[in-house]
Amino acid sequence: MNGRSTVPGLLRQRAADTPDAVALCHPDGSTLTFGQWDRSTDALAAALAADGLRVGQRVALLFDEREWFGFATAFCGVLRAGGVAVPLSARLPPGQLVDRVTVAGAVGTIREGCAVPPELGGWQRGPADADANADAVPDRATPAGPAQIIFTSGTEGSARPVVATHGNLTHGHDATPGRRQLAHSRHFLHAFPLGTNAAQTMLLTGLTAEPAALVMPRFDAAEVGAAVEEFRVGTLFLVPAMARELLDSGELHSRDLSSVVLVGTTGDVLPGSVARALAEALPYATIVNTYSSTEAAPARTTMVFDSRRPDAVGRGRVRITDDAGREVPTGEVGHVWIGSAAPPRRYLDGGDTGTFRDGWTRTGDRGRLDDEGYLHLAGRDSSTIHTGGTTVSPFTVEQALREHPDVRDCAVTALADPVLGERPAAVLVTRTGAVPADLRTFLAGRLSGAEIPQRVVCVAALPRNDGGKVVVRALRDLFPPVGSTATAAPVTVVERHLADIWATVLGVAAVGRDDDFLALGGNSMSALRLARLVADQFAVPTPVSALYARPGLAEQAAWIADRIADSP
């Protein structure tokens, strides 16, 4: 008897215990009870088995985000029939959908409410294309058998398919009365997109939690605020990007959200400044951030926000190792591994590349443990910036940027540099829509010279995927090539003379008043030469630090003019 060790077994147990309890609900008031969910699952499983679905065969699930009830039925129906579900996002371009179905080896697709690319192979059906009066079918799933294939976020490269067994998905879930999660709430709310690991976690939570799951088709700050107020939501699940949007929208202050006692964030690191603002806006709520990955789940760390260590992501089964896999001393940065007693996940293609080892999963992040065992992240392995022999963590730079009062959101990436190899560059979302004039001076007191971004651009919003994570590979495209945009000609006498010096030092034909010395290829050696020539030309002491603090031609010229005016 599989019982609680398979996903459909959990559903069967919950339907037997509380058949009329609401499992899922929509903001429009529609509901799906556990009894209805179980019966529709039986009907679909019987139809799939009758049509010849074999144990272990894979079935793609493609649903409009308003069709959570149908998705829940399809997911459990495929699993009860012994199949493997492949949840996909309807937001994906048709070509990517076809690629993922092909890579996963799906024999067919269950879809509802969205178009299916004509190139998609295999059979197609809807979740309701089954006999609603079908008898209960035996659960053909086993704890050790595969249950789902979910794709990683693909923010830095190609998304990879990850296989999870029933034992992995059900680990830690208990639908027994008195042991159900979130018993302090009548509803828990989320707006995680279908096809993501976060959405799958919410589906499993809905099977075993005490409250009903209030599912939002898409995240909209005003709609979430209204739903929380109307349904008196007790638990709110977000990704950090959603939390920022809620804070910026004013919804947390304009509505009665006093029912919220728990805010859980996942999918990315919750910045301390955002956690602090949430705690102030929702004084009755505990703010909790969960750190994990698609590959590592259900292994995780959990951190209740603590103003004494705002950037920690919690404690748990965590190891920090060097490149050879040896554990490093406390406080030293290395590769982050998190462990769990659950059956591990694996990549579908078997190319584990050192990710999975003896119950431990390498997350792809770098981090350190402090003296009390709290984990502090230092960025992605693949995002580390190597500039002139110095290693720069984008995560560290982003933390400093977020401390600026005008910066709402930010991301840091590496741009190629002909001398230093790479340089950090920042993409900002600011309250004014422009790069703060004092940004470099502000960062100079918080970061080393190598860590200060040498190019900065402002955008309306960062490029993010369905799960709210920044698409790192898209950041570089936001920076125009050096010299590709014309800038205004120097205006003042000082600007014109300084532009001539820049042209000599940098070996460029022309310099505009809006140009940036570092963006045009300036480095520490050329900055030294620039400082000497400026001192000779204008007869003012010129420390290199003054030039680094203001790399624009116009701002350097203004600084020089002020020094000249102050001269006796």
Short names for language-model regions:
Residues 31-35, 147-174:
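Conserved AMP-binding A3 loop
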